[in-house]
């Protein structure tokens, strides 16, 4: 084990000098001896002359020049396997839930090669989520990648929590949750929500929160992914939730300038596409098992053309776009049915009926969108009878796309609903064909299946 000395500290970036014949490799983990505190550094660059530039996986407070640094001769390694279920860990795989050691049988390095082309599998199986708007408009594939796009406060984390709850209870698989640069309060709420739903023993939680140094936020997604890869390689279907992928990019931006790189567009790191690719290419399904991933993506200033969300788009099978305009109408989940897409929405995958209903719903909502200007200027009375019918059905569809969530029961006061895909299709097909034209709009708001609409209408 070679020993070096710190020669420079700038924020989260630390330069260490080693003997010329014992220079650490890129991505090797180094350990700083700083009293009782042990700090791990990760080598990013070799500057020549035995000097390496590293990122600190923790606070660099209290570091000074001349401190001894040991090379561990391997990348950061984290515990994997069943011992991690029900536990909360940090970027280094250390427990932070005060429940003692993890007691793992195996540790894996967080930097791994993506599976080779021969190992990949192509699945067309659908994953039912029980959320009407998602199952109908942007269905998820088992082993696919899904992005939840939205600005601040439109419900990315709540949607994510509902998906985890539904999938854990209805499909009883293992999940890994990587909290990347999100609020500590949300991490706490999330843990208690999982405990209350009795699914905590099927979830591994890895947190690198907002208040932590950029090194933690940059690597915590890889820690969570490594745990998910272990479950996949055991032949399981595992779910990987990342909240929030934008903070992963942002952490890279924070350290990029300190590492001496020139910034690119909007101040992002020049290696943005490569960093995203390294992470996303590992999130994939092989012939032994599958990783289905759901990633929340913060959209800065609601601008989907920002380099960070734009780079993420390229890697996804389905995109769920949350809209501030729909949220302001009080319709939750605030998914935009015209903006959200999925590769699975194909008659060969979902079947002709599902495809026709989804496209029919989109065309009615699109027509309503076009008529809104006329209604705003001239009023409803100036529309033709046919257009009045379209508007009436569109407003019912819009309300029927809302749904009470299990994880939001505390706020809404109404019990959550899980709606099977066949009931979702039946409901929207009925609205489009005019079977429910006689029912009032309010009956369609915040309910589960179409049968509940009929019941609710009787009480109104």
UniProtKB/Swiss-Prot annotation:
CDD domains: ATP-synt_F1_beta_C (cd18110), ATP-synt_F1_beta_N (cd18115), F1-ATPase_beta_CD (cd01133). ATP binds at residues 150-157. GO terms for molecular function: ATP binding; ATP hydrolysis activity; proton-transporting ATP synthase activity, rotational mechanism. Keywords: ATP synthesis, ATP-binding, Cell inner membrane, Cell membrane, CF(1), Hydrogen ion transport, Ion transport, Membrane, Nucleotide-binding, Translocase, Transport. GO terms for cellular component: plasma membrane; proton-transporting ATP synthase complex. Its EC number is 7.1.2.2. PROSITE patterns: ATPASE_ALPHA_BETA (PS00152). It comes from the Bacteria. It is an enzyme of class 7 (translocase). It is a peripheral membrane protein. Pfam families: ATP-synt_ab (PF00006), ATP-synt_ab_N (PF02874), ATP-synt_VA_C (PF22919). It is found in: Cell inner membrane. It catalyses: ATP + H2O + 4 H(+)(in) = ADP + phosphate + 5 H(+)(out). Produces ATP from ADP in the presence of a proton gradient across the membrane. The catalytic sites are hosted primarily by the beta subunits. F-type ATPases have 2 components, CF(1) - the catalytic core - and CF(0) - the membrane proton channel. CF(1) has five subunits: alpha(3), beta(3), gamma(1), delta(1), epsilon(1). CF(0) has three main subunits: a(1), b(2) and c(9-12). The alpha and beta chains form an alternating ring which encloses part of the gamma chain. CF(1) is attached to CF(0) by a central stalk formed by the gamma and epsilon chains, while a peripheral stalk is formed by the delta and b chains. Belongs to the ATPase alpha/beta chains family. This is ATP synthase subunit beta. It comes from Pectobacterium carotovorum subsp. carotovorum (strain PC1).
């Amino acid at each position: 084990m070679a020993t070096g000395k710190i020669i420079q500290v700038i924020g989260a970036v630390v330069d260490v000098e080693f003997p010329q014949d014992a220079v650490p490799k890129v991505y090797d983990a180094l350990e700083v001896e700083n009293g009782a505190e042990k700090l791990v550094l990760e080598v990013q660059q070799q500057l020549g002359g035995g000097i390496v530039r590293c990122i600190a996986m923790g606070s660099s407070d209290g570091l000074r020049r001349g401190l001894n640094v040991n090379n561990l001769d391997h990348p950061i390694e984290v515990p994997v396997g069943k011992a991690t279920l029900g536990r909360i860990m940090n970027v280094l795989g250390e427990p932070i839930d005060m429940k003692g050691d993890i007691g793992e049988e195996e540790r894996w390095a967080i930097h791994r090669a993506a599976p080779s082309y021969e190992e990949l599998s192509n699945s067309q199986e659908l994953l039912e989520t029980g959320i009407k708007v998602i199952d109908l408009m942007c269905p998820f594939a088992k082993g696919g990648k899904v992005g939840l796009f939205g600005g601040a406060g439109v419900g990315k984390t709540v949607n994510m929590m509902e998906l985890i709850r539904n999938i854990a209870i209805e499909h009883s698989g293992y999940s890994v949750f990587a909290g990347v640069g999100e609020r500590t309060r949300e991490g706490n709420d999330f843990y208690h929500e999982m405990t209350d739903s009795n699914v905590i023993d099927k979830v591994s939680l890895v947190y690198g929160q907002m208040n932590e140094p950029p090194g933690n936020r940059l690597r915590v997604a890889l820690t969570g992914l490594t745990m998910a890869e272990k479950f996949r390689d055991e032949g399981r279907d595992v779910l990987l939730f990342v909240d929030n992928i934008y903070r992963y990019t942002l952490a890279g931006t924070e350290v990029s300038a300190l590492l001496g790189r020139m910034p690119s567009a909007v101040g992002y790191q020049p290696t943005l596409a490569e960093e995203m690719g390294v992470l996303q290419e590992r999130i994939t399904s092989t012939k032994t098992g599958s990783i289905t991933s759901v990633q929340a993506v913060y959209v800065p200033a609601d601008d989907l053309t920002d380099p960070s969300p734009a780079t993420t788009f390229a890697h996804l099978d389905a995109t769920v776009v949350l809209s501030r305009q729909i949220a302001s109408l009080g319709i939750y989940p605030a998914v935009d049915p015209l903006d959200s897409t999925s590769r699975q929405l194909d008659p060969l995958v979902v079947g002709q009926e599902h495809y026709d209903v989804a496209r029919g719903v989109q065309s009615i909502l699109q027509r309503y969108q076009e008529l809104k200007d006329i209604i705003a200027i001239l009023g409803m009375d100036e529309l033709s009878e046919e257009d009045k019918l379209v508007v009436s059905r569109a407003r019912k569809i819009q309300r029927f796309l809302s749904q009470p969530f299990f994880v939001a029961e505390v706020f809404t006061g109404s019990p959550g609903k899980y709606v099977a895909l066949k009931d979702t299709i039946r409901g929207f097909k009925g609205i489009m064909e005019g079977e429910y034209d006689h029912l009032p709009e309010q009956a369609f708001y915040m309910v589960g299946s179409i049968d509940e609409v009929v019941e609710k209408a009787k009480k109104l």
